[in-house]
């Protein structure tokens, strides 16, 4: 009989759950609604994917991440999970085929855009097949207090109520204040939910703020980017014009950069996003239209060229750095002009003809101004930046974290810069499978010998070849941490390979022999 732990190992290759995950899985399996607030990189998806494979019917994952659904589902399929997606990127024939297969019982997990819930074909499906669980990803989108309010999310409650039998409902988000959590509870009609908020602290992230006039920002940006070498990073700008100008600036210096914003056509956005995920470009310059749901683990820095509209947006965007747990830098460049730009957008949204009542729009504008106030406080505070963020999200914090620009004395900051430069020089992101990175996780298992590094190079190259054949990002095959563990432990059989963290049965069957050959050849030629 399958258990949560056996599913975790079989499909995802992990021996144990991260903090908070197992309790959520057990509550969902017991039929209790869940409201989980877990920071980026904490493993939210495991919390609903594992029970989805144990529950009898279909699990629906309602997500706004249309541009990423294909990759999200692709990663599940690579792990051996029967999954599909439904959104407006599919042709009519593709939608019809997907719905037919779903009615035939092909899928355990279906990702769906909220706008598709009312589609007649989808309505027929959910009336005919058992829906065991409805998962609401990025649940903060349901709240006007949230930074990504989407009116389409308000339809989810009625959709759940229309099902023949009420499924268990799980709501997941990376950032949610008390106001947002209240809205999620109310608008999804959660029934006595199990609520969990894991720590927002990301100890591996270094936070810094820099005041810079608009005329000074290009130089500040180039200084920051050039110090990063070949490391992957994201630069956020507040306007599409700023994105295009900044991308051209970086490209003019020979830096592989791409742009992403809503005014680009869908094909260009998709290509640029894929180029970043597949390591064909180093830096993505983007508006806040980019990043939600991006699961690229080796982003080493996030730079905000302009101040974001609120701390929820900032922390979620900055949190896209260092998802692999290794050191990463989050830098905010701000000026008074940024505040004026944000206020312009708030007023523009209030005056927009979007079908919402005037009083609702006025209240949304008031809440936006309140959030902007705290964002401005963060940008200018002389106190601990990490402490400011944690307290904003309702978490106790020490007076000093020792890992932000405000906590460090001038001499300490200079020393950190030197240490950071040395670390990054030794830990430069692998480009085209050239050089493996040393990291804290590597050091914890012992420094790699020269032989191990050569083997790791070969494993990276093999992963790149296999990812190219499968047309998936390299990290979907195996993570950097998994390959490092292979290089250290040198498994010589499938059974030994299954003892490596991140290697599940399905991936071992699909890729195991290809990596074992590399290890065997290296050991024999030693």
Spans of features found by a protein language model:
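Short alpha-helical "packing" element that flanks the helix-turn-helix/winged-helix DNA-binding module
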Residues: 21-24, 375, 483
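Short alpha-helical segment immediately N-terminal to, or the first helix within
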Residues: 27, 304, 378, 485-486
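Helicase motor core with emphasis on the C-terminal RecA-like subdomain
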Residues: 2-11, 15-19, 23-45, 52-55, ...
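Accessory DNA-binding and partner-docking regions appended to nucleic-acid-acting proteins
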Residues: 1-4, 340-341, 346-361, 367-373, ...
């Amino acid at each position: 009989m399958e258990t949560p732990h056996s599913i975790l190992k079989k499909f995802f290759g992990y021996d144990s759950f991260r903090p908070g995950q197992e309790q959520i899985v057990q509550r969902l399996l017991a039929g209790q609604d869940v409201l989980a607030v877990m920071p980026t990189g904490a493993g939210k998806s495991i919390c609903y994917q594992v029970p989805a494979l144990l529950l009898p019917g279909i699990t629906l994952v309602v997500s706004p991440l249309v541009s990423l659904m294909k990759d999200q589902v692709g990663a599940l399929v690579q792990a051996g999970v029967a999954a599909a997606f439904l959104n407006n990127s599919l042709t009519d024939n593709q939608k019809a085929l997907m719905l037919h297969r779903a009615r035939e019982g092909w899928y355990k997990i279906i990702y769906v855009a909220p706008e598709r819930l009312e589609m007649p074909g989808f309505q027929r499906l959910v009336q005919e097949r058992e829906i065991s669980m409805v998962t609401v990803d990025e649940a903060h989108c349901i709240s006007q207090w949230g930074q990504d309010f989407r009116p389409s999310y308000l339809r989810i409650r009625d959709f759940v109520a229309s099902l023949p039998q009420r499924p268990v409902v799980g709501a997941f988000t990376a950032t949610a204040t008390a106001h947002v959590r209240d809205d999620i509870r109310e608008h999804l009609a959660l029934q006595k939910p199990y609520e969990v908020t894991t720590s927002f602290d990301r100890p591996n992230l270094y936070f810094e703020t820099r005041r810079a006039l608009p005329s000074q920002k290009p130089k500040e940006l180039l200084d920051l980017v050039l110090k990063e070498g070949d490391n992957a990073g994201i630069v956020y700008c507040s306007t599409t014009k700023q994105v295009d100008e900044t991308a051209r600036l970086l490209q003019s210096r020979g830096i592989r950069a791409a742009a992403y914003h809503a005014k680009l056509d869908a094909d260009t956005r998709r290509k640029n996003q894929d180029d970043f995920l597949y390591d064909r470009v180093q830096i993505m310059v983007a508006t806040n239209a980019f990043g939600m749901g991006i699961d690229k683990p080796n982003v080493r820095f996030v730079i905000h060229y302009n101040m974001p509209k609120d701390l929820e947006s900032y922390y979620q965007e900055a949190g896209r750095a260092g998802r692999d747990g290794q050191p990463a830098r989050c830098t905010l460049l701000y000026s008074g002009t940024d505040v004026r730009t944000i206020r312009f957008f708030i007023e523009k949204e209030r005056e927009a003809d979007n079908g919402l009542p005037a009083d609702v729009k006025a209240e949304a504008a008031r809440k936006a101004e309140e959030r902007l106030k705290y964002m401005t406080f963060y940008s200018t505070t002389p106190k601990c930046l990490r402490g400011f963020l944690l307290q904003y999200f309702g978490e106790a914090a020490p007076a000093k974290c020792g890992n932000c620009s405000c906590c460090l004395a001038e001499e300490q900051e200079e020393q950190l810069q030197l240490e950071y430069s040395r670390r990054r020089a030794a830990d430069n992101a692998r480009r085209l499978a050239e050089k493996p990175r040393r990291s804290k996780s590597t050091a914890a298992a012992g420094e790699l010998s020269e032989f191990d590094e050569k083997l790791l190079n070969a494993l990276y190259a093999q992963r790149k070849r296999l990812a190219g054949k499968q047309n998936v990002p390299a990290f979907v095959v195996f993570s950097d941490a998994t390959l490092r563990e292979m290089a250290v432990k040198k498994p010589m059989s499938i059974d030994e390979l299954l003892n490596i963290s991140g290697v599940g049965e399905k991936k071992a069957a699909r890729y195991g022999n290809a990596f074992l050959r590399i290890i065997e050849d290296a050991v024999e030629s030693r």
